[in-house]
């Protein structure tokens, strides 16, 4: 999800 994608930054 979006939250996970953000954490991968």
Swiss-Prot record:
Modified residues (Leucine amide): 9
Domain of life where this protein originates: Eukaryota
One CC-aspect GO term: extracellular region
Keyword vocabulary terms for this entry: Amidation, Neuropeptide, Secreted
Any one Gene Ontology BP term: neuropeptide signaling pathway
Coiled coil residues, start to end: none
Location within or outside the cell: Secreted
Disulphide-bridged cysteine pairs: none
Primary subcellular site in the record, as a coarse category: secreted
Family of this protein: Belongs to the FARP (FMRF amide related peptide) family.
Biological function: FMRFamides and FMRFamide-like peptides are neuropeptides.
Protein name: Extended FMRFamide-6
Organism name: Namaquaphasma ookiepense (Gladiator bug)
